[in-house]
Amino acid sequence: MIFEIENKTIHASDAGQGIDPKKQTIVFLHGSGLSHIVWSLTEQFFSNKNFNVLSIDLPGHGNSDGPCLDTIEKIADWLESVFKKLQLKNLILVGHSQGCLEILEYAFKYKSRLNKLVFVGGSNRMPVHPDLIELAKNGDSDAVKLMMKWGYEGSKKFIGGNPVEKIIQSPRDISEVLAVDLNACNLSLIHI
C-alpha cells in the first residue's frame, strides 16, 4: 500500500489484503533503524485470522520517503495523520522496541482511536548509551553489531545469524536512520 502524507510517499504492507472497514486493524510499528519487513510473517498470520494488518515504514525507513522524524512525539503526531487519512479507528497497535515508545506516546495523545496496545521487547524508557549513538552517527557498522549483541543475545542460534543485521547494512542506513532513531529513543518523554 502506498499513500502520501505531507507530500511524502509512504509505504505500508497490508499483506496484500487491503483494508476492510468491517474488520479490526492491527498496526505493527518497527524498531530503530528497521522497516515493515520485520513484521512480514506476523502480518501474514494475523491477516489469516480475519484482521486487517498494516506494517508501516516510518518516514526515512524502508520504502518511505524521508527524512526520519527525530522525536517520538513527532512520530506519534505523524501516526495520527496516517490513521486519519486511512480512516482507521478501534486500533490494536503493536510496537517493537522504539515502536513501544511510539505507541505509548500515541496513546497519551490520541487514545480515542485505540482498542489495545501490545509491547514487544520494549519499555516506557529507552536510554541509549552515548557511545552507541556516536557509532551510529558515524555510520559505523559496530553500532548494529552491538545492538544485536545486547538486544538479541540468542541470535547466534539463528542459522545464518540474526536476519535483522542484514536489514541495517549501509553506512547511510546507520548514520541517517539508526542514529536518528536511537537519539529519539534516548530523548523520549515519559508520560506514565
Regions found by a protein language model. Give the residues of each.
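Conserved acidic catalytic loop of the alpha/beta-hydrolase fold
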Residues: K74-L91
